[in-house]
A protein has these predicted regions:
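Phosphate/dinucleotide-binding and metal-coordinating scaffold of catalytic cores
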Residues: 1-287
Length: 287
């Protein structure tokens, strides 16, 4: 693991802002096999009317701040991929190593954070490694695919799940941009509809013993009948016996990004402490 400090410039770009604005700097500190993260607001951001509480561990004052009993801040973990997206990134790193006869690269939180395609990144935080550089990741080789490509996307996800040893370059080329930004463990991808709106397609998994897409759609219908507001959802049977579940991205309105933070972040929890503490909806109500 490299030693020293690595800075990432954090920008806010949510609905109502005329342009992205520097919020502060996320610093990764590496040393003696350990890593820690700190965040410091930009002095101009503290004065702006756009500020809001983005994480209970990041309060409205200047100077370096550090997460409470956690390695990293929850709000930045929310901007990273979860199991499926990380699987894609690891498979890509392994494929690159095989092609060039190298040792596979070990991926860290910074790699996951900056490896997400900026256009489809969840939420409204954006990241740079230099102020005059591009928002990362800026690899436009694989644009968000149209709805018409859903059969190919589902086939790619199935191939990656089915065999750890296949030549994955073709399938990764199809899935990296649309799939690496998303959380959760299930195979999924971003797609764009005929109006240009982003959706998430959640594919059947090889481990499914029931039609989870159909059950998720039923939960959506029950939520609507209960008065809960949700973005539009659909199901389609693309291939095989189970449905693919589609949900319109809740963090987008046209080209506008909408900021969000997970319940885990805003209640001050983490994956680690939830191993020893059972969270509930009461925690959300108290927040």
């Amino acid at each position: 693991m490299k030693q020293g400090k690595f800075d990432i410039y954090v920008f806010a770009d949510w609905k109502g802002m005329a342009a992205p604005k520097l919020m502060g700097i996320l610093s990764a500190h590496y040393g003696k096999g350990k890593k820690a993260f700190g965040f410091e607001y930009d002095k101009d951001w503290i004065k702006t009317a756009s500020q809001r509480l983005i994480d209970p561990d990041i309060q409205f004052f200047s100077g370096a701040q550090f997460p409470n009993n956690k390695e990293n801040f929850g709000v930045f973990l929310d901007s990273m991929p979860d199991t499926w997206g990380r699987t894609l990134m690891k498979r890509k790193a392994a494929q690159h190593a095989r092609e060039f006869g190298e040792k596979p690269q070990t991926l860290y939180d910074i790699d996951y954070l900056l490896g997400v395609f900026d256009k489809t990144r969840m939420g409204a935080l954006r990241f740079k490694t230099s102020l005059d550089g591009s928002f990362l990741d800026d690899d436009h080789e694989n644009a968000t695919p149209p709805w018409s490509s859903i059969r190919e996307l589902q086939a790619a996800a199935k191939n990656l799940e089915d065999d750890e040893n296949i030549d994955v370059k073709k399938w990764l080329a199809i899935l990296m941009a649309p799939g690496s930004s998303l959380g959760g463990a299930r195979p999924k991808a971003n797609i764009v509809d005929e109006k240009g709106d982003l959706w998430i397609a959640k594919f059947p998994s090889k481990n499914d013993t029931i039609d989870k897409g159909a059950w998720e759609f039923l939960a959506y219908q029950l939520a609507l009948k209960s008065g809960i507001e949700m973005n539009e959802c659909r199901i389609e049977k693309i291939a095989g016996k189970h449905h693919t579940f589609f949900t319109k991205r809740f963090d987008r309105e046209g080209e506008d990004r909408i900021h969000f933070a997970s319940a885990m972040t805003m209640t001050g929890n983490s994956e680690e402490n939830l191993r020893f503490h059972t969270a509930s909806y009461l925690d959300i109500a108290e927040f």
